[in-house]
């Protein structure tokens, strides 16, 4: 690292690694990924949470109207679809008893992380348009930490789902004891605790800074800053991408071998069909996650190792990587709707309730009330019976 990367060195806006005095771009406060030395890179937004708080510096010093409209439209679509879809997934899992399986408990955790991530998009959009962070220091800390929490919790949950599928396919007897909703909830809590190992420090490191008339939401590092920034990026690359992807690859490799070598896993064709269907759904969700997140991780690690000159292609590539990462947060509900019959049926019942569905819900409520208040239920039954007798007695004779 040369002297230009020393403490206090700040590059100008012609450099994509320019400081936060440049006009912010979406995800700007989440960017540690473009480091030109000790100064946290303000001109490179980082959706992945690999970055601190700065923005990609447009060549003109401010975004063009077409760029701004395009980014705002994309973020708005992702935000609306992501929030609605993920909250619908969580509602379906909580609402329907049949959906409370171990796999769906993990899906609930994934939907929660994705919903939190998409909830930060309105703040990023305002930051992009205004060229400054107007929401104060507390929200700065919350938004940055949510970004890191989402990244780590999502990949840890997908890792857990892959291991869960491996146990279900390759060790079906052990799966009966291990794969329970209660254990799945405990594992979810553990995933959030593990994610706190990065989420909480980032929350304390996040702060707002005033630079040349604008406010930036950024991460602060001890000296030498360039060392700690690059160390953070490398650790995130290893623990939030390389290792989980290796674990997922091994699990699915073993599952594929098992599925090819054994014609029947459970002794029942119907159970086997469901097992393979769920395994396929989890595999697709994992594959989409890897496709959406690989570009940003590769981009960030390359940026940490070499200097990439500012070009139109570089700017477009960066925004494409960010958009791809955000898009993953709203894709999962769509995948569930197409790949899982139970989710598809529950989504349909929620959006277009039929008379039979309403009757089933009413019957379920009546049964629940009967269990919770047996004396009241008996009183209601007696009252209804008395009313029926009274109506029969007072009815006109034929």
Curated annotation (Swiss-Prot):
Region (Disordered): 362-383
Post-translational modification Phosphotyrosine, affected residues: 166
Gene null: resulting phenotype: During adult neurogenesis in hippocampus, increased numbers of granule cells maturing into neurons, larger granule cell layers and increased numbers of granule cells.
CDD domains named among the record's database cross-references: 7tmA_Mu_opioid_R (cd15090)
Residues listed as glycosylation sites in the UniProt record: 9, 31, 38, 46
GO MF entries: beta-endorphin receptor activity; G protein-coupled opioid receptor activity; G protein-coupled receptor activity; G-protein alpha-subunit binding; morphine receptor activity
Gene Ontology CC, one term: membrane
UniProt modification remark: Phosphorylated. Differentially phosphorylated in basal and agonist-induced conditions. Agonist-mediated phosphorylation modulates receptor internalization. Phosphorylated by GRK2 in a agonist-dependent manner. Phosphorylation at Tyr-166 requires receptor activation, is dependent on non-receptor protein tyrosine kinase Src and results in a decrease in agonist efficacy by reducing G-protein coupling efficiency. Phosphorylated on tyrosine residues; the phosphorylation is involved in agonist-induced G-protein-independent receptor down-regulation. Ubiquitinated. A basal ubiquitination seems not to be related to degradation. Ubiquitination is increased upon formation of OPRM1:OPRD1 oligomers leading to proteasomal degradation; the ubiquitination is diminished by RTP4.
GO biological process per UniProt: adenylate cyclase-activating dopamine receptor signaling pathway; adenylate cyclase-inhibiting G protein-coupled acetylcholine receptor signaling pathway; adenylate cyclase-inhibiting G protein-coupled receptor signaling pathway; G protein-coupled opioid receptor signaling pathway; locomotory behavior; negative regulation of cytosolic calcium ion concentration; negative regulation of nitric oxide biosynthetic process; negative regulation of Wnt protein secretion
Residues recorded with modification Phosphoserine: 363, 375
S-palmitoyl cysteine lipid sites: 351
Transmembrane segments: 67-91, 105-129, 141-163, 184-205, 229-253, 278-304, 313-336
Cysteine-cysteine disulfides: 140-217
Alphabetized UniProt keyword annotations: Cell membrane, Cell projection, Disulfide bond, Endosome, G-protein coupled receptor, Glycoprotein, Lipoprotein, Membrane, Palmitate, Phosphoprotein, Receptor, Transducer, Transmembrane, Transmembrane helix, Ubl conjugation
Subunit structure: Forms homooligomers and heterooligomers with other GPCRs, such as OPRD1, OPRK1, OPRL1, NPFFR2, ADRA2A, SSTR2, CNR1 and CCR5 (probably in dimeric forms). Interacts with heterotrimeric G proteins; interaction with a heterotrimeric complex containing GNAI1, GNB1 and GNG2 stabilizes the active conformation of the receptor and increases its affinity for endomorphin-2, the synthetic opioid peptide DAMGO and for morphinan agonists. Interacts with PPL; the interaction disrupts agonist-mediated G-protein activation. Interacts (via C-terminus) with DNAJB4 (via C-terminus).
Its biological purpose: Receptor for endogenous opioids such as beta-endorphin and endomorphin. Receptor for natural and synthetic opioids including morphine, heroin, DAMGO, fentanyl, etorphine, buprenorphin and methadone. Also activated by enkephalin peptides, such as Met-enkephalin or Met-enkephalin-Arg-Phe, with higher affinity for Met-enkephalin-Arg-Phe.
Similarity comment: Belongs to the G-protein coupled receptor 1 family.
Protein name, entry field: Mu-type opioid receptor
Organism: Mus musculus
Upper lineage: Eukaryota, Metazoa, Chordata, Craniata, Vertebrata
Gene name per UniProt: Oprm1
